[in-house]
Amino acid sequence: MKLLHLDSSALGATSISRELSAAIVAQQRRLYPEVEVTYRDLDRDPIPHLTAQTLAQTDPAEAAAAEAVMQQFLQAEVIVIGAPMYNFAIPSTLKAWIDRIAVAGRTFHYTANGPEGLAGGKRLIIASARGGVYAEPSNDFQEPYLRQLFGFLGIDDITLVRAEGVAYSPQHRADALAAALAGLRAEQDAAVMA
């Protein structure tokens, strides 16, 4: 099994989404010892944002790099994304990666009945970290966007592991992380029992 692990937080070692995504990948390694993991840190190794030049693909090296990103995505059976909430949405580095994989004719196509995803059969696990608590859907453009986008690509097996309110206090941060990790352990136990 091939697993693609992406982190997008700019907070480095203090990042909750990075800690959660690492725990998810460790869980997958325990459940599936044969898993092959490809890791990309979108903060340390960002993908260029789309411009007229990148869309034209006139630079062979840039075109090859974009194709490598696409192949990593297409070959992965499981995708783990560390996705913190920045200003109600996702980091621009994650959006730049999404722009490279959401490509007509590759991961979706248009039909007489509307668009159809071509990237089904994958499992997506999102490690979501939020400084506040966003129970009101009108304030959350992160998780709905990720669900919509990956659903559009044909991925319907989506799991969210969320730690929220992490900016309220050190105790709230610790409690939110512990609750998210406990949820992961419960999921792992259920998978082992199945």
From Swiss-Prot:
Its cofactor is FMN. Its EC number is 1.6.5.-, 1.7.1.17. Pfam families: Flavodoxin_2. Belongs to the azoreductase type 1 family. It comes from the Bacteria. FMN binds at S9, S15, I16, S17, M85, Y86, N87, F88. This is FMN-dependent NADH:quinone oxidoreductase. It catalyses: 2 a quinone + NADH + H(+) = 2 a 1,4-benzosemiquinone + NAD(+); N,N-dimethyl-1,4-phenylenediamine + anthranilate + 2 NAD(+) = 2-(4-dimethylaminophenyl)diazenylbenzoate + 2 NADH + 2 H(+). The lineage of its organism: Bacteria, Pseudomonadati, Pseudomonadota, Gammaproteobacteria, Lysobacterales. Binds 1 FMN per subunit. The keyword Signal does not apply. One of its GO terms (molecular function) is electron transfer activity. Keywords: Flavoprotein, FMN, NAD, Oxidoreductase. Quinone reductase that provides resistance to thiol-specific stress caused by electrophilic quinones. Also exhibits azoreductase activity. Catalyzes the reductive cleavage of the azo bond in aromatic azo compounds to the corresponding amines. Homodimer.
